[in-house]
Amino acid sequence: TVYVDNGTGPMTVLDANNPPSGLTTDLVQRLQGLDVDDVDSNGITNEARKAMGAPIHGQPTMGSYGSGTEDYVVFIGSNDGLLHSINVNNGSENWAWLPRELINNVPVLRNNPGMGSVTRPLYGLDGNWTVAKVGSDNLLIGGMRQGGSNIYAVKLPTTRTGIPELKWKITPATTGFSRLGYTWSQPVLTRVRVGGQEKDVVVFGGGLDYSTYEIGGSSVVASTGNLGNAVYMVDAATGNLVWSAASGGLCRRRRARGPW
């Protein structure tokens, strides 16, 4: 089952018979794992494709559905834009989620364009995720690394067949996060005292400012970019900003190479 979010709240199953804007029936079927392009040239287009996008920089994260038993799963993002929930016992997929912001990547990836010598590859959910117990919720919190500038918190269902929810989302357009760059930093869950009470918070770095890099290996000795040079602390339950610090100083580099 592949889900797409509708803002915060329970996610919606991607329906090949009623695809959302930006997708077609065959694109949804491809996301669902069908060999709609007959990659193996056997004339069958409704069989399993048995392939997923490359998890280039992200690493698997172990978690549990919190159903009272040892119901462990592995979560990993991939560069076709999907976050996968995988059964640790047999490797089967429980469900996958496509962030709405990455819908427009799907037809581009299907066309599989050639990559020129100075072209940066198209990335999806490329970062590492953190499992966090916040109140009664099990949350999966992560960014996009090379895929973009968002931070997501997914509320996990209590069973493998339950529906995941998008608990909260942070983007550079969110108030207080204008310095947020590409979200390379893996979020860290901790507790601090706020207003005399302990609070679960998530801390992450401001990320990378891609505007300061030249693709193709050109040297960049200094940057006046305004993105990424910040540290953020947010309420783990809501995503609301608790504290931040930023610097307007130069960031000196020896060399910036690309593509990665």
Enumerate the predicted regions with their spans.
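A fold-level detector for beta-propeller and closely related beta-sheet-rich head/sensor domains
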Residues: 1-260
